[in-house]
Amino acid sequence: MDRWVWVCAAGLFAAVVVLSGCDVQRIAELEEGVSTEADVRERFGAPEAVWEGPEGSQIYEYNRQPAGHQNYMITIGADGKMAALRQVLTPQNFARVEPGMPMEAVRRMLGKPMKVTPYDLKAEIHYDWRYLDGPNTSDAKVFTVVFNRDLRVLRTETARDPALDPPNR
C-alpha cells in the first residue's frame, strides 16, 4: 500500500511540473497592455473566479491549487486589454493578511485555497495555500490563515509542506 501511495505521489508531482511548464509558456505569450481578454482566455481558459477591479477592470483568478504552487490574478482593463498578470502566493502578499481581515478579502488577495479545514472544538477554520519559498519544489511550504467562526482572521502560520515528508512506517 505504501509503495502505491508513493507511485501516485510521484505521478502527481510529474503532472505539477508539466503543468507549471505550461504556465510559463502561456505567460510568455502574453504582454501587458497588448494582449486582449480573448488572448488570456485562449491561453488560460475560463477563470476560477472574476472579481470587480478598480476603474471598470476585472480580475480573473486562475487557481493552481491543490497540486500546484501558484495562483494567478490577471487584470483585464476597461479597454479589454491585459493590464497585469501576477502570481499572488508570495511572502509579500502573505504579510498583508492581518488579524480581523474578512475571509472574502483574503480570498480576493490569494485566490482559492488548496484546502479548508474546520476545527469545530476550537471554533476555527484553517485555509491552506501551497507555495514555493525558493526556486525548487523542495522549497514548498504551506501558508495557513486561521479564521474564527465569523470568518475573520485570527492569525497566520507557515510550515514546510507535509507532502515533502515521507509517511512514517
Regions found by a protein language model. Give the residues of each.
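Sec-dependent bacterial lipoprotein signal peptides
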Residues: M1-S20
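Residues within mature, well-folded domains
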Residues: C22-R169
